[in-house]
Design a protein with these regions (language model features):
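A long amphipathic alpha-helix within ATP-dependent nucleotide-binding catalytic cores
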Residues: 148-154, 163, 199-260
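C-terminal active-site "lid" helix and adjoining low-complexity regulatory extension at the edge
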Residues: 237, 255-292
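Coil-to-beta-strand transition motifs
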Residues: 77, 168, 177-183, 244-248, ...
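Phosphate-binding site of ATP-dependent enzymes
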Residues: 97, 124-216
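Short catalytic/ligand-binding loop motif for oxyanion handling, primarily in non-cytosolic enzymes
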Residues: 67, 90-93, 109-114, 122-123, ...
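Short, flexible loop/turn elements at secondary-structure junctions
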Residues: 86, 107, 157-159, 177-179, ...
Length: 292
């Protein structure tokens, strides 16, 4: 019975995505999505997922293929070094990998393995891990454009920590962009697995805007006042160029030890069902999304 439900769910996402997107919204928020008058950022992301051509979303959400796009736009210097890419976990060439690197899939967000040969590692355990990860992503969260990405494994450079920044993890600068306009930056820090602290900073000048977060989110997290990244001006220029032509996209960058690194382009953050932003801020950000 479980297999049958899985098959039916997958079939519906593939062939009736708008119905399934609306169904998932109702499950998450307890109300129907207003397809005719979407106002918030979340609502407009749902509309775009269901009604727009998301072919480019699929290409640019692929952590391997997006690298060509970044080079085409003139920002190849922001890419981490790519050590290899494989279709099968058994084909990972551990002998050719450097002492430290990152292994992850190109299509998901939970497969990351930090490889440090100096500390020893279980090769077979890593292979089995990636065998489990090489499955289509996006069906459970009803994000159809992810389901079209061919799952692969990649090995890339480990971005160094910047010890001058007060964070237990790399600070992930997430820029919310609307067709060339960079609206804000959400610096995320003190990451533990998939959990992290995310703030809101407005730009030009860089200034905190926690009013855009829900009261529940503010009360359940310990915040730090993150200074503007040293290379903020160039980061914003990168975001302007990369986001042009897209109604909305979140562009993730790192600024560490004097260098900018590209992270990813995300077109439906949290499936377009984000809960950390207040209703008012959701509507403000949504007002910048021009639907085709």
């Amino acid at each position: 019975m479980k297999q049958l439900r899985h098959f039916v769910h997958k079939f519906l996402v593939d062939h009736f995505p708008k119905f399934m997107i609306g169904r998932e919204w109702k499950i998450q928020f307890g109300e129907k999505l207003d397809w005719n008058n979407p106002k918030t950022l979340n609502e407009k992301i749902q509309w775009l997922m269901a009604n727009a051509d998301t072919t480019e979303w699929t290409r640019l959400a692929d952590k391997i293929l997006v690298r060509d796009f970044i080079k085409e736009k003139g920002f190849g210097d922001t890419l981490t070094e790519l050590y290899g890419a494989w279709d099968r976990a058994e084909d990972i060439d551990f002998d050719r990998l450097p002492e430290k690197c990152v292994l992850k899939c190109n299509h998901d967000c939970e497969s990351i393995v930090i490889l440090d040969k100096s500390k020893g590692f279980d090769k077979q355990e890593i292979i089995e891990h990636f065998k489990r990860c090489l499955v289509p992503f996006g069906y459970g969260s009803v994000e159809p454009h992810y389901t079209r990405i061919k799952p692969r494994i990649m090995a890339e450079e480990l971005i160094p920590m910047d010890k001058t920044v007060d964070s237990s993890s790399l600070v992930d600068y997430k820029f919310w962009c609307f067709d060339g306009f960079v609206h804000n930056c959400t610096p995320c820090y003190d990451r533990k697995g998939l959990d992290m602290v995310c703030d809101i900073n407005l730009l030009e000048p860089w200034r905190l805007y926690r009013e855009g977060l829900t009261k529940e989110y503010r009360e359940s997290h310990v915040f730090k006042d993150m200074p503007a990244p040293p290379n903020l001006d160039r980061m914003m220029e990168i975001c302007r160029v990369l986001s042009t032509g897209f109604p909305e996209v979140r562009i993730d960058l790192y600024d560490t030890n004097g260098r900018i690194y590209f992270g990813e382009m995300t077109f439906c953050a949290s499936g377009g069902r984000m809960r950390q932003f207040s209703q008012e801020y959701q509507e403000e950000m949504g007002s910048y999304v021009k639907l085709p």
